[in-house]
Amino acid sequence: MRIGLGYDVHKLTEDRKLIIGGVEIPHDKGLLGHSDADVLIHAIMDSILGALALGDIGKHFPDTDEEYKGADSMKLLEHVYNLITSKGYKIGNIDSTIIAQSPKMAPYIESMRSNISKVLNTDIDNINIKATTEEGLGFTGAKQGIASQSICLLLLTSQNN
């Protein structure tokens, strides 16, 4: 088994959609980034890549590459899933936290879990997502950005045991 930790942050800005966990969330601002800036998916991908000792999302999907401009992070997650299986692993579980003062994430968490479990070909019970605020402190508390943390456990597939 292997464990990986991921973290991502993006600045909130006008004239962008807010997409988190593959869900478009109604909000007056969205996240700024080269791709769709899905902070949750980016943290999850980094945790998986870390568990596989394959670097980070900047190595695999550089923001200097026009191919990834405006990219759907769920499609990038599909690529990361292929790396998991090619290395002989499967998802054990993923536990993630979204850190945002607003909007409230609770109404969207089940859709996020469903999206992620489908792409990673794992039971929805293996995907946990929590949301918290920083009580008005820091850049997330000041509503300047949104952050996410993720930890994953990868298990060897049965054919590799």
From Swiss-Prot:
Molecular-function GO terms, alphabetical: 2-C-methyl-D-erythritol 2,4-cyclodiphosphate synthase activity; metal ion binding
Gene name for this UniProt entry: ispF
EC number from the UniProt entry: 4.6.1.12
Species assigned in the record: Clostridioides difficile (strain 630)
Domain of life: Bacteria
SUPFAM superfamilies xrefs: IpsF-like
Binding site for 4-CDP-2-C-methyl-D-erythritol 2-phosphate: 8-10, 34-35, 56-58, 61-65, 100-106, 132-135, 139
Site residues, Transition state stabilizer: 34, 133
InterPro entries: MECDP_synthase (IPR003526), MECDP_synthase_CS (IPR020555), MECDP_synthase_sf (IPR036571)
The UniProt record lists the keyword Metal-binding: yes
Listed name of the protein: 2-C-methyl-D-erythritol 2,4-cyclodiphosphate synthase
Job description of the protein: Involved in the biosynthesis of isopentenyl diphosphate (IPP) and dimethylallyl diphosphate (DMAPP), two major building blocks of isoprenoid compounds. Catalyzes the conversion of 4-diphosphocytidyl-2-C-methyl-D-erythritol 2-phosphate (CDP-ME2P) to 2-C-methyl-D-erythritol 2,4-cyclodiphosphate (ME-CPP) with a corresponding release of cytidine 5-monophosphate (CMP).
Family: Belongs to the IspF family.
